[in-house]
Amino acid sequence: MKIYQKVLLFIATIFTLGTVSKEVHANEFNFSVNPVLPENQIGESGYFNLQMSPGQSQTLTITLKNTTDKTVVVEEEIASATTNINGVVEYSPNKIKTDSTLKYNLVDYASIPKEVSLLPNSSQQVKVSVTMPKENFNGVIAGGITFKEKDSEKTNSNSKGLSIQNKYAYVVALLMQQNKNTVAPDLKLNSVEPSQVNYRNVINANLQNPKAGYLNQMYVQAEVKGLSNSKLSYKANKEMLQMAPNSNFDYPVSIGDGNKLEAGKYRLSMTVYGQKNNDGKFTYVDSKGKEQKFDYQWKFTKDFTILGKTASKLNSKDVTVKKTPWYENWLIWLGLLLILLALFFLFFILWKRRKKEEEEQDLEKEKLKAQLEEMREQISREDNSDEIDV
């Protein structure tokens, strides 16, 4: 299969904890990585792009060199290729879930030692065992091999006292295929739902590449319009995206900093172009006003609903949305008023009941008093009658 992707020999990846990024330089590494390309390598490239027969097993070699005067321990890990939220293919381990269409995960067909110790100023060859699935298939199994110095986190501090930990790693792409047959690309829209990116409200459109081939040079036009409120409209256009084989990612449509999500019905309209070709039949005008030709085009329309409780929850977590003080929230005041009214009616009912009980008690006392008075009069009459008889 023809791969249109240009993969660097080494993808120096920086994982930054915080909001400050830093360019990776060669001197950040205490070791170097050099893949030894085998005879069944496809094309002239600095990464593994192998053509293998069904069921074939093979051992690959990668040379690691320690360029320091101390022992360096290198951690090694294999991962399947995924697509991140920026529309960039990831070859290193991450938290992105594998797609439901991924039949052949590179992790199941390649293995490498977990770590290797490099003596000072020495080189060592690392062996990678790979096996092609026995079944015949068209397409590519894609992923990467990550090399990272153990305990290599470096902490930098800025003038405000913010500590930032940087992790540096070499990533060598590893592609395996049985033939060079072209796999026609496809694209699907799965779901559309509100979410957040970096604590900011967005509407995510999940795009899926269900084929075992790269989807290259993607240009995306997306617009979300309010159906319940026609004044609401959000757009997000991006260019030169790429998707890994059998992967999906959330394409975010920002609603803008400071804007609250509104509950209601919405409609997403999206057009995606793929694979540039001067003879392509689909035309797109890019951000510079230049016409671009593409071989493929996909159009999607999907209606969705944002619930009130979902909007409230996301708005409360959006760091750019101004929070309404509690004393300005009419719902809180209404709630307090209802509570006061409920308490008033409760006290009123209890007071009426107590008053009624007291009146009944007074009436009983009056009746008892009258009965006692009547008994006294009767006794008095009987006494007088006895005196007369005598």
Identify the residue ranges that each predicted region occupies:
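N-terminal edge beta-strand
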Residues: 29-57, 194
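Short, solvent-exposed loop/turn segments enriched in Ser/Thr/Gly
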Residues: 54-61, 123-126, 138-144, 199-203
